[in-house]
Amino acid sequence: MAKRDYYEVLGVAKNASDDEIKKAYRKLAMKYHPDRNPDSKDAEEHFKEAKEAYEMLSDGQKRAAYDQYGHAGVDPNVGAAGAQGFGGFADAFGDIFGDIFGQAAGGGRARGGPQVYRGADLRYSMEITLEQAAHGYDTQIRVPSWAACGVCHGSGAKPGTKPETCPTCHGQGTVRMSQGFFSIQQTCPKCHGTGTYIPEPCAHCHGSGKVKETKTLEVKIPAGIDDGMRIRSAGNGEPGINGGPSGDLYVEIHIKPHAVFERDGDDLHCQMPIPFTTAALGGEIEVPTLAGRASFTVPEGTQSGKTFRLRGKGIKGLHSSIAGDLYVHVQVETPVKLTDQQRDLLKQFEKSLAEGGPRHSPQSKSWFDRVKSFFE
């Protein structure tokens, strides 16, 4: 089945800002997260689709490629033939611009020397809890990656042999072709721009110079990190080609939905049910925070939906000593399954309210006044 447009998946316009894209993704992630829909395959597919769309559109380079070329622009299988399977889509641009400016987008070459490529960046998606995001912690991750072959030491050639100068391009990495009145320089089809070829490939890595491995890396999650942020681990991407530098690893953070709190920047929000007696008479209530319990006083006559602000009970911002606030939205709870005695007491209470006039129900009086003026 054909993939849907990434902008359509997130429900944003093609000129949407990074913040709009992030907010749209967070909304969908909260709605379709597997933790909230444990038995829904449909929700799982929606979550994966939204996650893929966000990963592409939140990366400026990938978004630009997608905007110009669609799904083909970000498909890792497109353009993979260049540079013996390394570099992918970026190498296609490298061949074009490298011929014009003397170096490739993915690397460069000294004149007469083999093409040098920087290793591809890797991305690792990591889910953490809200508590871990708030307090920070150190952890280990296992990342599937590529490493230089230990048998041929990354050369791709059988031990005892070495790569030879490409006979087609004579080590230049490019060949010139004439088409009518034009002379076009393009990547050598035999060596794929490396300037060398391998007559006897290494049996262990089949001439690629790299082997699959799983790296165990230490990752420090800083306190205050937010959903969608990335942590860069320099040099832990794929190895370079022909002496090129290794790429980087980007650990992208996704925060799981919390059972109690919703995060908005450095602020937290929670819904707090309170008995109708506490709402009417006032009193002290306890609320959970990420640092333990806190208490505050509910004034007499509190209405359902009233919001209370607890300063400094939110999350400390990234690299900041100042914490956000906790917003408690109280919901007045109506009692159910009353006994006969409780029902009689409430009827007496209701009668006493009626005798006292509208002063006991200011919201009802205001509402009825508005309705009355509407029909006049």
Swiss-Prot record:
<dbReference type="GO" id="GO:0051082">
    <property type="term" value="F:unfolded protein binding"/>
</dbReference>
<feature type="zinc finger region" description="CR-type">
    <location>
        <begin position="136"/>
        <end position="214"/>
    </location>
</feature>
<comment type="subunit">
    <text>Homodimer.</text>
</comment>
<dbReference type="GO" id="GO:0051085">
    <property type="term" value="P:chaperone cofactor-dependent protein refolding"/>
</dbReference>
<protein>
    <recommendedName>
        <fullName>Chaperone protein DnaJ</fullName>
    </recommendedName>
</protein>
<dbReference type="Pfam" id="PF01556">
    <property type="entry name" value="DnaJ_C"/>
</dbReference>
<keyword id="KW-0143">Chaperone</keyword>
<feature type="binding site">
    <location>
        <position position="205"/>
    </location>
    <ligand>
        <name>Zn(2+) 1</name>
    </ligand>
</feature>
<dbReference type="Pfam" id="PF00684">
    <property type="entry name" value="DnaJ_CXXCXGXG"/>
</dbReference>
<keyword id="KW-0346">Stress response</keyword>
<keyword id="KW-0235">DNA replication</keyword>
<dbReference type="GO" id="GO:0008270">
    <property type="term" value="F:zinc ion binding"/>
</dbReference>
<feature type="binding site">
    <location>
        <position position="191"/>
    </location>
    <ligand>
        <name>Zn(2+) 2</name>
    </ligand>
</feature>
<feature type="repeat" description="CXXCXGXG motif">
    <location>
        <begin position="202"/>
        <end position="209"/>
    </location>
</feature>
<feature type="repeat" description="CXXCXGXG motif">
    <location>
        <begin position="149"/>
        <end position="156"/>
    </location>
</feature>
<feature type="binding site">
    <location>
        <position position="202"/>
    </location>
    <ligand>
        <name>Zn(2+) 1</name>
    </ligand>
</feature>
<feature type="binding site">
    <location>
        <position position="166"/>
    </location>
    <ligand>
        <name>Zn(2+) 2</name>
    </ligand>
</feature>
<dbReference type="GO" id="GO:0006260">
    <property type="term" value="P:DNA replication"/>
</dbReference>
<dbReference type="GO" id="GO:0005737">
    <property type="term" value="C:cytoplasm"/>
</dbReference>
<dbReference type="GO" id="GO:0031072">
    <property type="term" value="F:heat shock protein binding"/>
</dbReference>
<dbReference type="InterPro" id="IPR001305">
    <property type="entry name" value="HSP_DnaJ_Cys-rich_dom"/>
</dbReference>
<dbReference type="InterPro" id="IPR036869">
    <property type="entry name" value="J_dom_sf"/>
</dbReference>
<keyword id="KW-0862">Zinc</keyword>
<feature type="repeat" description="CXXCXGXG motif">
    <location>
        <begin position="188"/>
        <end position="195"/>
    </location>
</feature>
<feature type="binding site">
    <location>
        <position position="152"/>
    </location>
    <ligand>
        <name>Zn(2+) 1</name>
    </ligand>
</feature>
<dbReference type="InterPro" id="IPR008971">
    <property type="entry name" value="HSP40/DnaJ_pept-bd"/>
</dbReference>
<dbReference type="InterPro" id="IPR036410">
    <property type="entry name" value="HSP_DnaJ_Cys-rich_dom_sf"/>
</dbReference>
<dbReference type="InterPro" id="IPR001623">
    <property type="entry name" value="DnaJ_domain"/>
</dbReference>
<dbReference type="GO" id="GO:0042026">
    <property type="term" value="P:protein refolding"/>
</dbReference>
<feature type="domain" description="J">
    <location>
        <begin position="5"/>
        <end position="70"/>
    </location>
</feature>
<comment type="function">
    <text>Participates actively in the response to hyperosmotic and heat shock by preventing the aggregation of stress-denatured proteins and by disaggregating proteins, also in an autonomous, DnaK-independent fashion. Unfolded proteins bind initially to DnaJ; upon interaction with the DnaJ-bound protein, DnaK hydrolyzes its bound ATP, resulting in the formation of a stable complex. GrpE releases ADP from DnaK; ATP binding to DnaK triggers the release of the substrate protein, thus completing the reaction cycle.</text>
</comment>
<dbReference type="InterPro" id="IPR002939">
    <property type="entry name" value="DnaJ_C"/>
</dbReference>
<dbReference type="Pfam" id="PF00226">
    <property type="entry name" value="DnaJ"/>
</dbReference>
<dbReference type="InterPro" id="IPR012724">
    <property type="entry name" value="DnaJ"/>
</dbReference>
<keyword id="KW-0963">Cytoplasm</keyword>
<feature type="binding site">
    <location>
        <position position="149"/>
    </location>
    <ligand>
        <name>Zn(2+) 1</name>
    </ligand>
</feature>
<feature type="binding site">
    <location>
        <position position="188"/>
    </location>
    <ligand>
        <name>Zn(2+) 2</name>
    </ligand>
</feature>
<keyword id="KW-0479">Metal-binding</keyword>
<keyword id="KW-0863">Zinc-finger</keyword>
<dbReference type="GO" id="GO:0009408">
    <property type="term" value="P:response to heat"/>
</dbReference>
<feature type="repeat" description="CXXCXGXG motif">
    <location>
        <begin position="166"/>
        <end position="173"/>
    </location>
</feature>
<comment type="similarity">
    <text>Belongs to the DnaJ family.</text>
</comment>
